[in-house]
Amino acid sequence: MQSAIIVSQQVLVMFLMIGCGLFFNKRRLISESAAREFCSLLLNLALPCVIIQSFLRPMRPEYLSGFAMAIGIAFAMHLFAVAAAQLLIRPRADEGYRVERFSAVYSNCAFMAFPLLRATVGEDGVFYATAFVVFFILFQWVHGILVLGGSVNPRKLLYNPCILSVAIGLLIFFTQCPIPAPLTAAVGMLSAVNSPLSMVITGVFLAGLPLSGLRNIRLVTTAAIRLLVMPLAAIAVIRALGMPNWIETGPVVCTSLV
């Protein structure tokens, strides 16, 4: 019950920040073009700092085993999501089904999951959720691009800022090399920008969307798959495997987001 209250409060906070973005866009104080520039800042700086910060911890056996379990769960959940989208969203003459499949598989977990996890299970949740985000990025840049009809560029995938930040984080975690306090503080401050700025940007983009889309049965179906089918399947599988609560929370929260 306490976790539900904490999550509800955190979701309300996130909606308030989204509302700020919507308000500022309607008042012509933040344009969509400016929001796109902020997106670049998030993807190339703030989110990598969140990932690196999650690895700034002592190396313990329980962290290693937990991270390994989180990797296995993340891989299995993405495979299931891809298969479910292929099965539930059938090809049509128009190309819209490609976007629907992509939307059913890939959430906004890279930005929205971390504040929810930090509020419910602490920094450990963020650490284990990093495993999910790694596979999210890998699948998105390979399967996601193919679904949308594009071609995969291994070089772009390899030099993705989030992939590079995971490599840096793992290096720091396994070597336990000391990080200067000013650098640690800078990473922490930049990572703190991730959630509020991403919510404001979301509000800016929502301000330009027509409400008529809510009457589109295909969009509603895609949203139901994304927000109901995927999380419920994740909960069922993880509980059937008897995973600890802190392992369950991270992937389920990541899967449940829009």
Which functions belong to the PLM regions below?
Residues M1-V258:
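Alpha-helical transmembrane segments of multi-pass small-molecule/ion transporters
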